[in-house]
Every structure is written in structure tokens, then in C-alpha cells.
Amino acid sequence: MASQKYILTEIKKGYNLSWYVCSQCYYAGTIKLYDDTGKVYFTCSKTSGGTSYQSLAQGHADFMGNELYLSVEIPQSTKIQQSITANNVTDAHAVKVGQVYGFCIEDSTDEDYNDFYIDVVGWAKKG
């Protein structure tokens, strides 16, 4: 079983979170977003085989922990690879108002990096 844990260091306590998860991988897998207090923001699983495109999760919440974690588990895989983008959300004056993370996950050897896609964004304020 392959698993990987990521620390989303640029999303700070009090940020308003939003996320989206989708998959077109053949293997089953589980994605979880949680914090250092034990609060789980979401857990989603792809349980069926096949490569049809599936939306697995979307939602939002306020982040009140100190560290935010994302875990990926793929039982049939021996190695998880990833391509990660991390960008600031800025206002019209180039002041940082949030953070975006995009995770493109590879579960096997074809290196297409489209097996799981996870988008997590946090804004310093909501509304």
C-alpha cells in the first residue's frame, strides 16, 4: 500500500477553506484533509475500478488548527508520485489574501499525473 502525507504550511489558522477532489485512476484510493487538532474536514474514497472520471468531494470550512494535512492512500499502488502547484492569492495591490494548492497525483507507472486531482484553497477572510 502506498501512502503520502503533505503539510499545507501556507494555509493559516482562521483561513476559510474550500476544496475539490476528482479521480480518473484505475485503483481505489482515499483522500483526507485534516488538522493537528484531529478535526477531519473531509475524507473521500474512490471505491470502484475503472478510469471513468469521478468527482469525489467538494466543500468548505473554517480552518481553526495550527497545521493542515492532506493524506493520500492507494492500497493497490506501490508508490505515489505528485506534481504540486502552490500559489498566493493576491489582491489588486499584490498583498497576499490566501493560498492555493493543486495536487496532481500519479498512482502507477504511466506518469500522466491525472489519477487524483486535489485542489485546496484558503482565504484569510470570508464574505
Language-model features, listed with the residues they occupy:
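Extracellular distal adhesion/interaction modules in secreted or cell-surface proteins
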Residues: 1-98, 102-104, 114, 121
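Short beta-strand-to-coil "C-cap" segments at the C-terminal boundary of structured domains/repeats
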Residues: 119-126
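Short, exposed beta-strand-loop hairpins at the edges of beta-sheets
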Residues: 107-111
